[in-house]
Amino acid sequence: AVNPQVYEPDLAMAQSNLGTLYKDTRRYEDSEKLCLSAMEIRRRLAVANPQVYEPDLADTQYNLGCLYYNIQRYEESEEMYLSALEVYQRLTAVNPQVYEPYLVRACNNLSFLFLAQGNFEEAERYAREGAKYDSTHHTIYTNLAASLLLQGRYAEAEEIYLRYKEELKEDFLSDFEDFYQRGIIPPEREDDVERIKKLLSK
């Protein structure tokens, strides 16, 4: 490039946008190449000017986390989500109004990533972290309730299921179907899950 300083931010944005489009249309290999290229550029730009480019870097890392989750490369997904979360925590400390929703979104996805792998303690940890920052983002409570239930903490889980029953009933029930398909519900918790399903269906 004749003048990379001028054009690299636009190039990274174009790559990131196209990478997201490819992810949404399941062209995962193409998506990964573009997002990795965008991340490399944005990482370089963020070193020189963090205030301007760190949010873009975190956004690309978050999108890569989603991509890797979709293709079940969970370790890489975790790495990207954690990198994005670290940036969002820093940004939220300075400007909570703008960045809290992004931080909560990253916590939510990390929580579900750990749920999907049967790591219920870590799922609880990130659900609580997200809820601490923004109690209005209620979908994070689907992960918190499930992580408690599948650890055998029925009473704590039941309280959340009842509190958000009207608002999140369909999400709760579809999560259970997903967990059954993944085979992550411990046999000793199956009766508890059925009890909650009946409770939600009343």
Identify the role of each PLM range:
Residues 81-85, 146-172, 197-201:
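TPR/TPR-like (Sel1-like) alpha-helical repeat modules
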Residues 167-202:
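Terminal, low-structured helical/coil segments at or just beyond the last alpha-helical repeat
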